[in-house]
From Swiss-Prot:
Chain intervals with Polar residues compositional bias: 704-724
NCBIfam families: SAM_YgiQ
Domain of life: Bacteria
Radical SAM core domain residues: 372-650
Molecular function, one GO term: iron ion binding
Gene3D superfamilies assigned to the protein according to its UniProt record, in alphabetical order: tm_1862 like domain (3.80.30.20)
The protein's name: UPF0313 protein YgiQ
UniProt keyword list: 4Fe-4S, Iron, Iron-sulfur, Metal-binding, S-adenosyl-L-methionine
Stretch list, region Disordered: 685-739
The protein's required cofactors: [4Fe-4S] cluster
Co-factor binding comment: Binds 1 [4Fe-4S] cluster. The cluster is coordinated with 3 cysteines and an exchangeable S-adenosyl-L-methionine.
Positions annotated to bind [4Fe-4S] cluster: C386, C390, C393
Amino acid sequence: MSSISLIQPDRDLFSWPQYWAACFGPAPFLPMSREEMDQLGWDSCDIILVTGDAYVDHPSFGMAICGRMLEAQGFRVGIIAQPDWSSKDDFMRLGKPNLFFGVTAGNMDSMINRYTADRRLRHDDAYTPDNVAGKRPDRATLVYTQRCKEAWKDVPVILGGIEASLRRTAHYDYWSDTVRRSVLVDSKADMLMFGNGERPLVEVAHRLAMGEPISEIRDVRNTAIIVKEALPGWSGVDSTRLDTLGKIDPIPHPYGEDLPCADNKPVAPKKQEAKAVIVQPPRQKPWEKTYVLLPSFEKVKGDKVLYAHASRILHHETNPGCARALMQKHGDRYVWINPPAIPLSTEEMDSVFALPYKRVPHPAYGNARIPAYEMIRFSVNIMRGCFGGCSFCSITEHEGRIIQSRSEDSIINEIEAIRDTVPGFTGVISDLGGPTANMYMLRCKSPRAEQTCRRLSCVYPDICPHMDTNHEPTINLYRRARDLKGIKKILIASGVRYDIAVEDPRYIKELATHHVGGYLKIAPEHTEEGPLSKMMKPGMGSYDRFKELFDTYSKQAGKEQYLIPYFISAHPGTRDEDMVNLALWLKKHRFRLDQVQNFYPSPLANSTTMYYTGKKPLAKIGYKSEGVFVPKGDKQRRLHKALLRYHDPANWPLIRQALEAMGKKHLIGSRRDCLVPAPTIEEMREARRQNRNTRPALTKHTPMATQRQTPATAKKASSTQSRPVNAGAKKRPKAAVGR
């Protein structure tokens, strides 16, 4: 276990005096209609939460946590789930809130929820009853905010959730292929809360309840606001331009000047006078009351290098112990982003997860099936945060790098509650995990390093010597959980960080012996150093060592178990040769992947910055700094995805064409070392048929009308010319003689 952290909050999450409405007590479900409010005896809601998800009263759903958290503070909280956004009417169904609207797109970004990585429309939505698509608008945060303002103009609107959190600054938008303004500016909301929102949400709610205008609440951590100038008392660091070397003064020569000769005259002692002792306050730390001025929205939109520079700064200002505020100009105003909130302590985490959740969907949905709930209803979240720092992932920017773990007792109590209260429980816990399965209770062993570190990852390129890799707390938790009465099996479905696991083989033995249901998910993401260095993922040496240990312990337990690796195609830094080598590795190890994923440029991720700018924000940025190869265009992205499914005959023509272009024709054939088979006679005939349907050779003598014809129209014209002029026309009767 690590020492006591130096990163401490000003006050405990549950130390605020309860609001007067606490006398109503907790609601069975947070109300979604006026009828439910009447049954609770409420005349109005203090806070109304608007969400793009169905309301499931479960701690895996953000709105349930926020709602129950505010309820525990004494506020009356209503929920408007998946409202009809075509008018303001649905946003008025609970009446006017006394304090504010809280708006979120849901547990997922609404654009990622609606579109695939190839920008194709999805036809389902796991967070909607019966998996129906189209129940939330594109850019739901913007739409919901506009309707809330239209319904009650004088009620403050506070944004939250993953969609708003990752769009708090100017950001690249993959779906429109442009840089967009901060969502706070576009939505005209009053405040944005990024990351896990318990601390800022509770503080802002209480301050509003005490009569403080939201325009004067400007100093809350984990919030972003619109300002006209920097907050008073803060000093700034200008980073609107790239870092340049300053002038270095020459070192003075110690013997450069002749000193005067010594004078041996006696010196009379000076009269000593008493001096007052001045007690100075403790010196301010260099990051306190300091902000960084980022390049403006207008600058980053027009200059990709400045965009990468701004992204690099933002990712280095995420440690709550030493992060500075950020300030970015948008037109004649600024987006002011306060430092991240202090992580929750174990006691606070326990209190949050002990709130009176029903752990089922709201009764208004009847027997409708909600796939996202079905997936997690028998799972337990044991921690938050991730210190892996993978470039393509935004969990670190949202939940933080410091792991926030629950106590063993809290987790055991939740397992018992699932066993005793959740309908349909069969004795199997589907997951004990979080963003990563094996980071429970792992933190920095040095409090001072934890407070001041600005590394993007604690495990890349190597595991930091300060990082605790002792998995004993996790092993003890697993053992205690599976010994509970009525529990048949504890499965681990969250991804295992194998480079940390190999540091403690006891964990791998425990996992392989008791907690794998035949297959275990891990994510090497790639095999080649080029893309792995951009992803900030370990090399295949760690994977090979983990596989060796996993296979050994599985054999000792008498079990036949397999690893299921996940890979990403078309990630920045991935060349065609890298994907061919990955495909050969897959074939060598007899992997045939069914589901493959092209890289999806989500807002705020470092990989998205690489995708848009072609620069590497993991190192110092400059106009001549290292560039990154980016596989763009539908054809190249299709090829990379096809190479992951080298065994699919539908992909063979595309792969053959690419191998021939790369000079790797020797990989086509029936030999063992070949990637795809040679084309069959029928395939070659079909290719010739397709080649015939092309444009004829043109010369300067070809008529202009013929030059402009497509193959289809040329074929039609030639067939028309071959027919008689009056073919198919009705024959006219001969004219009468003498007429």
